[in-house]
Amino acid sequence: MEHSRQTMLSFLARLPEQEIVRSRDQGEWSVKDVLAHCVAWEAEATRRLQLVARGQGQRIHYYDDMREADRFNANAVRKARARGFSALVREAARVRQRLIKSLRRLPPRALQDPTHRFPVVAWLPEFAWIHEQAHLKEMRAWWSAQKPVWKPGSGVKRS
């Protein structure tokens, strides 16, 4: 989990700030919006882990309807747009650390506990690193398509 976040932040650190907040071709989300979306789901994962730790895993809300998930995403992006990118990066670090701390506090048996609708091992990888890496792959492809490429010997840059 720590590696996936560092990989994401290293990529973002190489982007010009104006590109981070500019809407991309994929939908209307900017790179900043995508990070806010990932951070919101990690905060949700942390909340779920805390419920599991308190023996209240049955209180976890699962987003079975994509409209619900879309509302969750839209709300996360809307809230983040009111803040600066640096503040969001700091929040991403805090949320990831809380997630790791919450996970480490769980006894190993809680990860596979069948009394919850879905055991932690069924949803945590998606919430914590698979999801982030999938978005990072999309953002890298988007950024590669934006950058001018210099071809040796051509004297011409293409975009």
Located regions from the model:
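Short, contiguous alpha-helical
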Residues: 21-71, 105-159
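Residues that form generic nucleotide/phosphate-binding pockets
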Residues: 11, 52, 79, 91, ...
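Short acidic/polar alpha-helix capping motifs at helix-coil junctions
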Residues: 10-14, 63-65, 74-75
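Acidic/histidine-rich alpha-helical segments that form the ligand environment
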Residues: 4, 68-110
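Long, hydrophobic N-terminal alpha-helical segment
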Residues: 1-3, 7-19, 26
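Aromatic-acidic/polar surface patches that form glycan- and anion
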Residues: 1, 27, 88, 92, ...
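Alpha-helical packing segments of well-folded alpha/beta enzyme cores
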Residues: 4-8, 41, 45, 88-99, ...
